[in-house]
Amino acid sequence: DTSEFDPLANKEYTEEQKQTLEQEQKEFLSQTTTPALEADDGFIVTSASSAQSTPSMSALSGNISPDSQTSDPITKAVRETIIQPQKDNLIEQILKDLAALTDRDLAEQKRKEIEEEKEKDKTLSTFFGNPANREFIDKALENPELKKKLESIEIAGYKNVHNTFSAASGYPGGFKPVQWENHVSASDLRATVVKNDAGDELCTLNETTVKTKPFTLAKQDGTQVQISSYREIDFPIKLDKADGSMHLSMVALKADGTKPSKDKAVYFTAHYEEGPNGKPQLKEISSPKPLKFAGTGDDAIAYIEHGGEIYTLAVTRGKYKEMMKEVELNQGQSVDLSQAEDIIIGQGQSKEQPLITPQQTTSSSVEPPQYKQQVPPITPTNQPLQAETSQMPQSQQVNPNLLNTATALSGSMQDLLNYVNAGLTKEIDSNKQIDLIKEAAKAILNNEKSDIAEKQANIIALAENTVNNKNLKPDAKVAGVNAVLETIKNDQNTPDLEKSKMLEATVAIVLNSENLEPKQKQQMLEKAVDVGLSLKDDASRAAAIDGIKDVVIKSNLSPEDKGTMLIAVGDKVNVSELSNAEKQKLLGSVLKKKGVEAQVLSPAQQQLMQQHLYKITAEQTKKDTIKKVNDILFDPLSNTELKTTNIQAITSNVLDGPATAEVKGEIIQEITNTVAGSSLEAQDKAAIIKGVGETIATHSDTSLSLPNKALIMASAEKGIAESQTNLPDRELMTKGLVDGIYEGKGGPEITKAVSSGIDNSNINDSEKEALKKAKDAASEAALDRDTQNLTEGFKGQNIEEHKPHDDIYNKAREVINAVNPVIEALEKFKEPVVSAEERIVQETSSILNNISKLAVEKVNNFRAMLSPTGNLKTLEEKKEESIKKVDELVKAFGTKSSTEEQQSFIKTNLIDDKTLSKEVRLQTIDKLLQEQKRAEAIENPSVKTEDVRVVSGKSKLKPISKDNPDIEKAKMVVGRDRVNIKGNIKIMGALMNARDIIQSENLNKSTPIKRE
């Protein structure tokens, strides 16, 4: 009687109730997911097959027949290593939840029920099969810690089962990848013939790829995913051709119809066990996470949500219902599985045939394979390397010319490996061994009968065979694998993206091998990185390097060795010929995503990687900066003053950047070198260099220390000294740099740095001497100017205002002279009068009072300026305000639509408004003129005109031609291809007139200046 195990067998349930229970149990099944397992190529975790008598839908149900009734050892192994430990942990969590339940009577009732049943049946089949216990099971499965435990049990358990029952371990009919073969008449149809060990056909599986009009599926978080491609597999219901058992696991596809990576793959599995008549019977359906269908019809495709992504399964609603009915009829069971490739396991009564896997070789020289590699999902398809006979050539026949013949004669990839291993055993010369491996790789990649997937699988098999071969010395193994990698690189028929997958898989085999030392692994890794960096398109290079880095992180290496491997990857990227931008991207990924987040790189390794990244970033910054400088220098619409301002801004940005002082110095050196080598007049270049020097000297001491300023200033002079321009021009620019230092109030250390820059430059001694003289002359001239200014200060300017004692004396003398006649007249009349001395004292006292008031007013003004709320600003702040004010004026001008409004704006805001500095108004005019000229439109593409413009007011004045000797400014002819001026002539004229007025403003010091 099986009713106690099977709620669906209870005749009190209606058919609808049975279906409801069945769906609930399927959803219960979804609560546990099997994480991707570590695997070798073709390493697939298979399900348990059993002879139990109930079609329970839960992986934890325990409704498996007693051991005595189970003939399938795989089922027994799954029960003992996976299902029962999971049940034990689940019951433990349920008991914890019951202890916290507020309904103490119900809690005690369920606790006793569990204890009593456990004494009779440790699998607790009745408890798990009772729908009344559903809420307790669901609540327990919501516990995140329990989920982790169940997943860890699955990982360890399925790994154990695979190692025991894989074909590579010698288990008859062990697991192997499906060999799909394209249909001759239709590209969307594929098929594979499944045979038992005796070679008798069990069935033919047909796969159809469906290209459909995109439809939308919603995920649990509400986001939507479009599906445009999926596949259907015609799973057999009845099998009556041959005896044996069969287990099919078909990978669920991503939303775009492609296969996911191994660590994200989920499967739909059908288990066919040998029935009473020897023929396979469908006994189990293993479906991942809650199964849903994209519609209500029988043709609706099944899908699941796994890890936040939508995956389609290769079964429709109609096929699924048909299979479930057969499972119930055959009294099967369903369990959860998660594998990484479509696989088949077929069992029968005959001797196992050779499989197309790298592990099965008859050569005793190959060590047993290690099952620790994580290889990307590569499903071999179509037939293997075809053959007519499996006769193996003798070792003396091994040479590059005969290897292709051997491949053509090979009955399978295994035969090729046997052939290679025989040659490696007989051949002592390591060079010839490597040649043999190389030619084998060429034979695989050149085989026209293999598709890309099969070539990938066979190349990986060859690499693993090389790593595990005992007849190869360690250095020969390195050279052999590197030869395979080089062959991949040189192959012209394999797409780069597919090559990247081969590289990733090969590195996984190498790093996880127990037959290699870390040094040898690193050598192979570096070769793989070299090949990856040599791929032609950016996406393939990124895929290769990222894949290799992921393999390093997931490998079984120690954390220290992982860090060493990542550093090796970074070093290869750093010395490659890639652009700095691409290097930054790849190194940033190694440092942050792969190294730091995965906690693999040590602090010292992180620092080393960061240095690589800083260096590359500095090179890129240098290139970007020099491009900006060149754009400014060669802009014909900006004068020297504007060029200087813009290059000063660039210099300031460099000084404020995150780079080291040495890197900043290198960039500043490039700036001055670029300016010095430009085609501008020497005076213009000197003016720009002066601005650079002033910017460095005045930069904030808090962000740039004095020693660093000196270092950068030396670099600035070195850029001038080493420029490819004549010596007089370099002397003039050196003087300009020194003038800038004095303008910026730079100290003697900064000035001395100019000499250091000259000494360190790569020029001859005579040029160094000349530049030092120019520097000294500029310094002396600057000191003379300072001394003269100081002397003038002592002499006094505006004597009447600043020398009050002179004012008193002169005023007193005037008073005396005026009073004397009055005194004389009064004396004549003998009337009492005020004496002249008394009047002088009174007048003097009044003047002193006025002076005192003036002094107090001045002192109060200074106090206000120096107070925390005062408006005293640094040079940098003033520059920022100027730039901001210019932008505001330009923006305001842009709001004026008519010519009259624009002319009025120019007069009011630029000519008449003396509260604005000359610099702000002139810069505004220059910017407005540039915008007027840049607003030119193409009227007649076929017409070319010329425009004569003033290069710079500071340019050296030369006659433009013999016919026009009186022109007073240097001019150049600017060719303007296919452009015709449409600017507003009135506005341009008004702007240029305003510029002339402002430049000629009276600078007499007696003119009152309104202070803000």
From Swiss-Prot:
Residue stretches of biased makeup (Polar residues): 62-73, 348-373, 380-396
GO cellular component: cytoplasm
Primary location class: cytoplasm
UniProtKB keywords: Cytoplasm
Record localization: Cytoplasm
Basic and acidic residues bias spans: 12-27
Name of this protein: Antigenic heat-stable 120 kDa protein
Region (Disordered): 1-73, 348-396
Biased composition (Low complexity): 47-61
